[in-house]
Amino acid sequence: MRAPGAGAASVVSLALLWLLGLPWTWSAAAALGVYVGSGGWRFLRIVCKTARRDLFGLSVLIRVRLELRRHQRAGHTIPRIFQAVVQRQPERLALVDAGTGECWTFAQLDAYSNAVANLFRQLGFAPGDVVAIFLEGRPEFVGLWLGLAKAGMEAALLNVNLRREPLAFCLGTSGAKALIFGGEMVAAVAEVSGHLGKSLIKFCSGDLGPEGILPDTHLLDPLLKEASTAPLAQIPSKGMDDRLFYIYTSGTTGLPKAAIVVHSRYYRMAAFGHHAYRMQAADVLYDCLPLYHSAGNIIGVGQCLIYGLTVVLRKKFSASRFWDDCIKYNCTVVQYIGEICRYLLKQPVREAERRHRVRLAVGNGLRPAIWEEFTERFGVRQIGEFYGATECNCSIANMDGKVGSCGFNSRILPHVYPIRLVKVNEDTMELLRDAQGLCIPCQAGEPGLLVGQINQQDPLRRFDGYVSESATSKKIAHSVFSKGDSAYLSGDVLVMDELGYMYFRDRSGDTFRWRGENVSTTEVEGVLSRLLGQTDVAVYGVAVPGVEGKAGMAAVADPHSLLDPNAIYQELQKVLAPYARPIFLRLLPQVDTTGTFKIQKTRLQREGFDPRQTSDRLFFLDLKQGHYLPLNEAVYTRICSGAFAL
């Protein structure tokens, strides 16, 4: 875009003509002619097409910044902000459990969280102490971390799918002095009890399973019934920059990391979602996402705690109950993540899916290939796709419904929100730098790593990192925008078009090179899944001895062993370039996913195409014969020895 140079030329021409004594109208017309002739027409086109979008985005940014500044100056925290909501509407429904039908008003949520605060203060816990929470999503989950926050304590929110080593690891790295777990988690806690420190105090909440209560465990619910529901007599001196709780990364590439969430980050994330998608106080939000992650607990529950919306919780997503729940509770906003939209499209068409009042679906991970199919089939007017990790400072949002886009950054005023796509080595993901040692910005259409400039004094740009200092340092680069600055490295590759819309490409490590070409796992997964009726698919690269690059491998869910590999190949030939067609197929009962419905590839990549590592059906694409062959140990040996041409 040549707007800066064109603008300078037009200003110079305007000054010269004015000095010559020509009327200002003639001078302005001549300057405009120079501007357009110098390439400025591109900038004018961008202004015309994006001004409305950018002005709305700017208004959201300003609004969130002003709200945050007001709360910071007043010394508020999330519990203090929630207290104001309770005083405004004590009897309005705050949380509804769709699984049990249990309803909590704002006054009841306030009383429960007060009981939690008073109890843990009486038990000797102090501000700054960490308490781990390990139970399924229900109103008590919110009341527990909110109550701990009222007492100045910090919750570590554990993924309920963790077991054995990962569970013990997360508990150990959290520094928790106590563990609150649900009755449904007794067996999981029992498995790691021998690895937990003797000083860890354990509390169990909810109905006990057949295992009964574990040794040295206190029943929490009776203790809470005896605790005072009045506000704490002494409110801890906390502010918006203090820690609220810890959320663990999904662990798709290894053991989870504890991301630090401060009060201002919680507020910022919830506020951006609220204003960017024009949520209203009368909205009812359906939240079937895990509460141990930010989408469910901040973007979703945050609308309740900060803005007073009613939030309907379901502890686990159910494709068959989704629209029935929305109809029953008059939901107007729903959340999605990962593959949820695809799972809904897999359901048989029925009348109920159009009788709802849902106008907005907010989330991330909606594949462009099914975007319009989802909106047309279910009658949802707006998709609020966004991009952003729990800890990142470069979140973006699609505010105007651009199909396939996960957000935008203004081309008119790019420095208002200092994020950027920068060039990287596509094999190593190493930052590429210019002669001055600065990162090289990508041009429109060029894929690059998303980075955000860090300013710890600005709540919109700060990066709080992880409990692990080494993990934090790995996410920071220096001299990115300017000499000596610091920037957050998202680890994600996006591409921006000429109008500033950004599109998610791949998480770093999810692209691989084969036959001199870059293969996008996201693209191949989308194509395969669509061909197979929205089946779960994981695509990744595997190393083959003596062969440059990585060969594509696709793991496909085939629980009833009905898929024909060669029928799949016939279809792939029509829609994928030769280098993108998977060389190896793995047909398995189900594809592993995380708690947020993201495909889990770590185990699959480790096992590769070695038939000794799995009992799943494996196939190899014989290019000479033009079809897939069963891959047994003999074929595996021949591939590794170079007998087959890849």
Curated annotation (Swiss-Prot):
List the ranges whose topology is Extracellular: 1-13
Q: Which Gene Ontology terms cover its molecular function? A: arachidonate-CoA ligase activity; biotin transmembrane transporter activity; efflux transmembrane transporter activity; fatty acid transmembrane transporter activity; identical protein binding; long-chain fatty acid transmembrane transporter activity; long-chain fatty acid-CoA ligase activity; nucleotide binding
- Tell me what reaction this enzyme catalyses: a fatty acid(in) = a fatty acid(out); (9Z)-octadecenoate(out) = (9Z)-octadecenoate(in); hexadecanoate(out) = hexadecanoate(in); (9Z,12Z)-octadecadienoate(out) = (9Z,12Z)-octadecadienoate(in)
Binding annotation for AMP: 246-257
**Family annotation (Pfam families):** AMP-binding, AMP-binding_C
Q: Where is this protein primarily located?
A: membrane
How the protein sits in the membrane? Single-pass membrane protein
Expressing tissues = Highest levels of expression are detected in muscle and adipose tissue small, intermediate levels in small intestine, and barely detectable in liver. Expressed in brain gray matter.
InterPro entries, per the entry = AMP-bd_C, AMP-bd_C_sf, AMP-binding_CS, AMP-dep_synth/lig_dom, ANL_N_sf
Subunit text: Self-associates. May function as a homodimer. Interacts with EPRS1; mediates the translocation of SLC27A1 from the cytoplasm to the plasma membrane thereby increasing the uptake of long-chain fatty acids. Interacts with DGAT2 and this interaction is enhanced in the presence of ZFYVE1.
Protein name, entry field: Long-chain fatty acid transport protein 1
- Give the species this sequence originates from: Homo sapiens (Human)
Q: What lineage is this protein's organism placed in?
A: Eukaryota, Metazoa, Chordata, Craniata, Vertebrata
By which gene is this protein encoded? SLC27A1
